[in-house]
Amino acid sequence: MGFKLISLLLLFLPLLTVTILSGVEQAFASDKALLVTGRNITADGGRSSLRGKKQRRASGCNLFQGRWVFDASYPFYDSSKCPFIDGEFDCLKFGRPDKQFLKYSWQPESCTIPRFDGGAFLRKYRGKRVMFVGDSLSLNMWESLACMIHASVPNAKTTFLKRTPLSTLTFQEYGVTLYLYRTPYIVDISKERVGRVLNLGAIEGGADAWKNMDVLVFNSWHWWTHKGQSQGWDYIRDGSSLVRDMNRLDAFYKGLSTWARWVDQNVDTAKTRVFFQGISPTHYEGREWNEPRKTCSGQMQPLGGSSYPSGQPPSSGVVSKVLSSMKKPVTLLDITTLSQLRKDAHPSSYGGDGGTDCSHWCLPGLPDTWNQLLYAALTM
């Protein structure tokens, strides 16, 4: 039934409106504590919820406060045996000589994250649908989860369909489908007389495909910062105003607020668990971790300790502000600080395109920990 529905969506999505451009088309064109979120994630399984602007400290362990420790049992899988990894994330394939970056696990301060079990995941979510919605960091996380599950059931029959904007991977025996919907801004980009317009108040292009999922994981931020040739729009529509540009944090706040209203109005959270993937950091500016003139290139170890020298980015504050205003419970996967500590985990020059990528993450690698935390939130 799920595949028939998605097939129909794929057939009719281009007909909904020729003016709505998928976020991925734009992408390919140039392509601490959780106290103010809709739901805290602690060792009590994230059952402590917040409403409105109330702040309440949950009991138990904060899974996102901790440090990286060497772990010889890692990684979860062999990249050469996973058929779902894009070249841009396959660092070992493109010659990364060191492998120490694969051997770190995240250790919270006062509890233990359950080790990921792909077979248990498939059994628990038999017949269920899990969707990642966002930019290429969502792609990073989607492919990571696919590889983690595949490593547990390497002989399982799968159906893999990769398209723009909607891709699917189904583990047939279990009826579990992982979806990826590529839309870098979440809100719409439309083609108008003046050019490409980023509409901060509209979510129409493809949002119906997000409905009726069992798990939704949203992500957005990186594309809001792009300028020049990599910018995905020509104008911004802010209410009745059409402007060439505006403060990017303000634009992100308004766009994310539109997403929040969409979730509040369209998602039955009694049936669907909703997550927002916290801001994924970049490592182009070494001064952020007290190594001026350095980037992620040549980095071979994570930062020690449990905090990042320059602190969290302002965009994380925007996410917290929006989530705290929502009526429906949304769980923040607060992966920002733990990811900031992993300056060693980017493709750098081993992403296959000849550039230096300090934005995405190698697979195997850091996104496996994001999925381990997602697994913890779903099972603990």
Curated annotation (Swiss-Prot):
Gene Ontology molecular functions: O-acetyltransferase activity
Compartments where found: Membrane
Short name of any one Pfam family annotated for the protein: PMR5N
Residue ranges annotated as motif DCXHWCLPGXXDXWN motif: 357-371
Keywords on record: Membrane, Signal-anchor, Transmembrane, Transmembrane helix
Chain ranges for the short sequence motif GDS motif as given in the UniProt record: 134-136
One GO cellular component term: membrane
Residue spans crossing the bilayer: 7-29
Record bears the keyword Transmembrane helix: yes
Tree of life domain: Eukaryota
Signal peptide from the UniProt entry: none
Membrane topology: Single-pass type II membrane protein
Anything else known: Contains 2 motifs that are conserved in esterases, but it is unlikely that this protein belongs to the catalytically active pectin esterases.
Cited function: May act as a bridging protein that binds pectin and other cell wall polysaccharides. Probably involved in maintaining esterification of pectins. May be involved in the specific O-acetylation of cell wall polymers.
Entry similarity comment: Belongs to the PC-esterase family. TBL subfamily.
Name under which the protein is recorded: Protein trichome birefringence-like 38
